[in-house]
């Protein structure tokens, strides 16, 4: 039972526990969407 529930929790929790990662992902997506040249968006 515990093993079956853990994987889903592991995938869902890190996003809430690590706001820095979510922020980086958001910033990366925003940069890529704003800048047509991905390599230079850095």
From Swiss-Prot:
<keyword id="KW-0528">Neurotoxin</keyword>
<dbReference type="GO" id="GO:0005576">
    <property type="term" value="C:extracellular region"/>
</dbReference>
<dbReference type="InterPro" id="IPR011062">
    <property type="entry name" value="Contryphan_CS"/>
</dbReference>
<keyword id="KW-0800">Toxin</keyword>
<feature type="modified residue" description="4-hydroxyproline">
    <location>
        <position position="36"/>
    </location>
</feature>
<keyword id="KW-1015">Disulfide bond</keyword>
<keyword id="KW-0872">Ion channel impairing toxin</keyword>
<keyword id="KW-0379">Hydroxylation</keyword>
<feature type="modified residue" description="D-tryptophan">
    <location>
        <position position="37"/>
    </location>
</feature>
<keyword id="KW-0027">Amidation</keyword>
<feature type="disulfide bond">
    <location>
        <begin position="35"/>
        <end position="41"/>
    </location>
</feature>
<comment type="function">
    <text>Its target is unknown, but this toxin may modulate voltage-activated calcium channels (Cav) or calcium-dependent potassium channels (KCa).</text>
</comment>
<feature type="region of interest" description="Disordered">
    <location>
        <begin position="1"/>
        <end position="24"/>
    </location>
</feature>
<dbReference type="GO" id="GO:0099106">
    <property type="term" value="F:ion channel regulator activity"/>
</dbReference>
<feature type="propeptide">
    <location>
        <begin position="2"/>
        <end position="31"/>
    </location>
</feature>
<keyword id="KW-0964">Secreted</keyword>
<protein>
    <recommendedName>
        <fullName>Contryphan-Mo</fullName>
    </recommendedName>
</protein>
<keyword id="KW-0732">Signal</keyword>
<feature type="modified residue" description="Cysteine amide">
    <location>
        <position position="41"/>
    </location>
</feature>
<keyword id="KW-0208">D-amino acid</keyword>
<feature type="signal peptide">
    <location>
        <position position="1"/>
    </location>
</feature>
<dbReference type="GO" id="GO:0090729">
    <property type="term" value="F:toxin activity"/>
</dbReference>
<comment type="similarity">
    <text>Belongs to the O2 superfamily. Contryphan family.</text>
</comment>
């Amino acid at each position: 039972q515990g093993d079956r529930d853990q994987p889903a929790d592991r995938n869902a929790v890190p996003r809430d526990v690590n706001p820095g990662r979510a922020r980086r992902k958001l910033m990366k997506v925003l940069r890529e969407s704003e800048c047509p040249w991905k390599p230079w968006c850095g």
